[in-house]
Amino acid sequence: METVAVRDIFKNYKEFSNVKLVGWVRSNRDNGSIGFISFTDGSCIHSIQLVYKNGETNNFEEAKSTRTGSAILVEGVVVESKQPNQSFEIKVTNFILLKQADEDYPLQKKEHGAEFLRTIAHLRQRTNKYGTIMRLRSELAFAIHNFFHQNNFVWVSSPIITSNDAEGAGENFYVDSKTVKNFFGKNASLTVSGQMHAEAYAQSYKRVYTFGPTFRAEKSNTNRHVSEFWMVEPEIAFCNLEQLMYLIEEFVKYLIRFILKNCKDEMTFLNKLSNNTLSEKLLNAISHPFEKITYKKAIAILKSDVANKKVKFENESIYFGMDLNSEHEKYLCEKVFNKPLFIYDYPAEIKAFYMKMNADGTTVGACDLLMPGIGEIVGGSERESDYTKLVKKCTKANMKVEDIEWYLALRKYGYHKSAGFGLGFERFLMYVTECENVKDTIPFPRSYGSLDF
């Protein structure tokens, strides 16, 4: 008899009679002559109750002594359950203990806090909550590739090791060999963005995207920062800012619709954890157009509301040219508009060197997308297409022009226009799961002062 997945039994348990299952014990209790195991095989969020009885189950005593976390193989019969919270259970006829878990297995049948679970990141996905989050991570990764494939984008595997800093912020991890000094002949670092390489390929395919890990050496240990995270970075030739914001909105709404349609069990579970507010939030996000305001308008709203004492910020020095703090973004997104919000046309001095200057000579064609409860999840812009202007901006930013000459030179060879954005994958996961810490949305988080596992 072939083994059956728990997922398939839950689809229609009445189609099954005798089954063989292999997986792990979530919990085990007995009252002497009868015992109950909560069983999972990782194929879905659900557990199945296994019932074993003295005289009816082979290896009954072994079943009684099996500890939480152990691997087992069972054969049994699918029967209707008398319990109000389950439709069926498995009456075990044959029980085989494949591997007994040690007594110090840390995930016993009780609630564990997020901070403790981060110390056992190699095991936390066995809990309902983190198992659900990581399954959603997998489903969303598939959805991302699916969206771009449906919209005729070419996936570009941008390099992890690079010699350029796409953001110009200098927050790099440097790479070298222990055995060969100056291995690459120049400074090498882990990528902070795949944007530059995506721009090169967009000039051949028009629509491209990268999706992979990026690295930032930020000396920060907040609930919003990790040193290794994943970015989705599309790049589109002949695209302007208005078209880019349209694409961002369509992309974000597609991802939300995808999980609401294809991950119903996971979303139902997370919705209960949020006191039934998560599904309402997500449905509202996809039911209405995203709001759009200029940076100038955002500053005007903030200044007015501070002056009229409608709001109190820690930083109440509001002026054109400031970098908006998270408290300002949160207020605009959640209190003023109460919906996803684009802010666009930022002052050039607070944005990256590669962004295209607007006709006013002070702002650039850049946008950020803010989501209620999380803040910025997307940053995008039109790219400067003039070679001479871009060289001047690099020089002004104290960048070594020779290190990115290949990138600058793209402007000499038919580079008319391009625009792109970056979506922080973990930030987006925080939004759709209502996780409060980005470290809980990535399997093995890396952050300042922490490199476990």
From Swiss-Prot:
What sort of enzyme, by top EC class, is this? ligase
EC number, UniProt record: 6.1.1.22
Molecular function, one GO term: ATP binding
Q: Can you name this protein?
A: Asparagine--tRNA ligase
State the UniProt keywords alphabetically. Answer: Aminoacyl-tRNA synthetase, ATP-binding, Cytoplasm, Ligase, Nucleotide-binding, Protein biosynthesis
Its principal location? cytoplasm
Instruction: Output the GO biological process annotations, alphabetical, semicolon-separated.
Output: asparaginyl-tRNA aminoacylation
Family the UniProt entry places it in: Belongs to the class-II aminoacyl-tRNA synthetase family.
Reactions catalysed according to its record: tRNA(Asn) + L-asparagine + ATP = L-asparaginyl-tRNA(Asn) + AMP + diphosphate + H(+)
Please name the PROSITE patterns in this protein's record. Answer: AA_TRNA_LIGASE_II
